[in-house]
Swiss-Prot record:
Gene: ctaB
Keyword presence, Cell membrane: yes
Pathway: Porphyrin-containing compound metabolism; heme O biosynthesis; heme O from protoheme: step 1/1
Family under the similarity heading: Belongs to the UbiA prenyltransferase family. Protoheme IX farnesyltransferase subfamily.
Protein name as annotated: Protoheme IX farnesyltransferase
Classification via Pfam families: UbiA
Membrane-spanning parts: 35-55, 56-76, 98-118, 120-140, 153-173, 180-200, 226-246, 248-268, 292-312
Major site of localization recorded for this protein: membrane
Subcellular location(s) per record: Cell inner membrane
Amino acid sequence: MSVIEQNSVEYPPLIVSEAGVSDYIALLKPRVMSLVVFTALVGLVIAPVHLHPVLAATSILCIAVGGGAAGALNMWYESDIDALMTRTANRPIPRGRVSSPEAAAFGITLAIFSVATLGVLVNWLAGALLAFTIFFYAVVYTMWLKRWTAQNIVIGGAAGALPPVVAWAAATGSLAPQPIILFLIIFLWTPPHFWALALFRSDDYARAKVPMLPVVAGPDATRLQILLYTIVLVTVAILPWPLGYFGAAYGLTSVALGAGMLWFAFNVYRYRTGTQANRAARALFKFSLLYLFLLFAVLPLEVAAHAVAAMIW
């Protein structure tokens, strides 16, 4: 045996991550991020102080990246649950495309970047609110509430309701009733929306041992809670009109959309078995997305209409 052969050492093969750009984008939860960006834009546009376009774009980018960071940390911590659920089994970590340490590092890096950038370039109230939003979703909801209480969606919904508040703070450096109203609408919208999903995905949640309300309290109790929360949501969403915070266009839209939400929620409560029950839950889930989108979309249009009227008159 030669000296070279005697001293040769076999090294383990270098493990190269299979993750592509699309896998890291998936970690950001793009569909959730789109809702975050949309509601934040509304909060920014209706604020009485208008940021310089560069700062406005920076604010929205930071809020989007912060929301994505929270999503990545959520996927990192919940990879064991995701692997057990049909709806989430194809996410990057369960599929082995991204490792848990990579996802955690990715999420933490984005979180620090988004908060620091928003704080330094815009203002620290917005930065602090964004940091709280990420912490609440990634730690309070993901690591605690999701696995321990059937009220996980109710309390955890606060994180998803904060983006318009962060955006308003970015524009004004302060808080006011208007962003709090937007917060309350999203907060009250979250339980009917996600419990409708949980009704027709209850087997998935039960398999993963996630204590969603239909799994813990049963489908009938969930249907009642959906109806009650919808009644409160519709009422709270209409009130800003008579209170003078939003205009007639918003008010009429909220009344019309509220009637639709109540109708779909009542159908969920009424149909309790068979395909009709699943169909009603799916219909509410889909309509609730349209409800929130149209309700928020009318606000920038109202602001634009007032601006045009002011120029004319």
